């Protein structure tokens, strides 16, 4: 039963590795949109049959780019290097149009696609930082319990923050996040503050490997 706004997650039928996501707020809307997307070839029946339906959290989306160091003897083992957000096509183009214009578009243009085409850097208000670290620490602990030796180095928690300032994690990247490339030249805002110099994710990985080699502890950071 669909009794609130949801997002239906499945693969795009024609674009490899891209999304065929769509939103709906009722079973009737689910049926109408899925049939329209099937007709236009955006999705296929096999993917629709295995689609995942999640509650859609209304709020801004932030990717939290963390780094976990098992080598750290002093200070914090978990670092928040930076935050980014996404540009999605054709969704971002749709939201710049007045609602009446969206309603008069041809059927094949009315349902936006959510293909990530870029990223930009962001910050979050200070009162939300403590909770962000709590999420990162919980993820590290869970990864150790279920996938020994757990997460090492960079990882990304993809979150949404609602109107009551609650975080919702809708996906994770147990690796270098795609949005970190916006910080290659100038570093991450939070990483720069921690290390007092431009600190991109790539530089932080290089530092960790150098420290591990100098301490003869490479096996602790490599799997």
Task: Please annotate each region the language model reported.
Residues 64, 76-79, 157-158, 165-170:
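Conserved active-site beta-strand-loop modules that form the wall/rim of enzyme catalytic pockets
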Residues 54, 65, 147-164:
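A short glycine-rich, hydrophobically flanked beta-strand micro-motif that places a catalytic Asp/Glu
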Residues 7-9, 65-66, 165-176:
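A short beta-strand motif that forms the metal-chelation/ATP-contact edge
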Residues 66-143, 173-202:
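ATP-dependent carboxylate/phosphate-activation module, predominantly the ATP-grasp catalytic core
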Residues 131, 154, 167:
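Short, well-structured alpha-helical interface segments that form or flank functional binding sites
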Residues 156, 162, 181, 187-223:
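Peripheral (often C-terminal) accessory segments that flank ATP-dependent C-N-forming ligase machineries
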Residues 59-61, 90-91:
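Short acidic/glycine-enriched loop/turn segments that link adjacent beta-strands
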Residues 1-59, 67-85, 125-138:
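Active-site nucleotide/adenylate-binding loops and adjacent lid/helix of ATP-dependent enzymes
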């Amino acid at each position: 039963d669909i009794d609130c706004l949801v997002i239906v997650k499945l693969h795009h039928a024609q674009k490899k590795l891209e999304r065929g996501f769509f939103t709906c707020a009722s079973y009737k809307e689910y049926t109408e949109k899925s049939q329209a997307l099937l007709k236009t070839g955006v999705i296929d029946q096999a993917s629709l049959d295995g689609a995942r339906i999640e509650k859609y959290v209304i709020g801004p989306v932030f990717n939290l780019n963390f780094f976990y160091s098992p080598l750290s003897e002093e200070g914090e083992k978990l670092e928040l290097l930076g935050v980014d957000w996404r540009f999605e096509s054709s969704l971002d183009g749709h939201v710049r149009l007045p609602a009446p214009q969206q309603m008069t578009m041809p059927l094949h243009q009315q349902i936006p696609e959510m293909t990530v085409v870029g990223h930009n850097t962001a910050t979050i208000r200070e009162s939300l930082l403590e909770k962000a670290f709590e999420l990162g620490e919980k993820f590290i602990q869970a990864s150790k319990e279920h996938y020994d030796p757990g997460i090492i180095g960079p990882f990304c928690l993809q979150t949404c923050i609602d109107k009551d300032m609650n975080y919702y994690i809708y996906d994770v990247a147990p690796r270098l996040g795609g949005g970190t490339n916006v910080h290659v030249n100038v570093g991450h805002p939070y990483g720069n503050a921690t290390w007092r110099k431009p600190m991109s994710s790539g530089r932080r990985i290089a530092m960790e490997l150098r420290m591990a080699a100098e301490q003869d502890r490479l096996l602790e950071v490599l799997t």
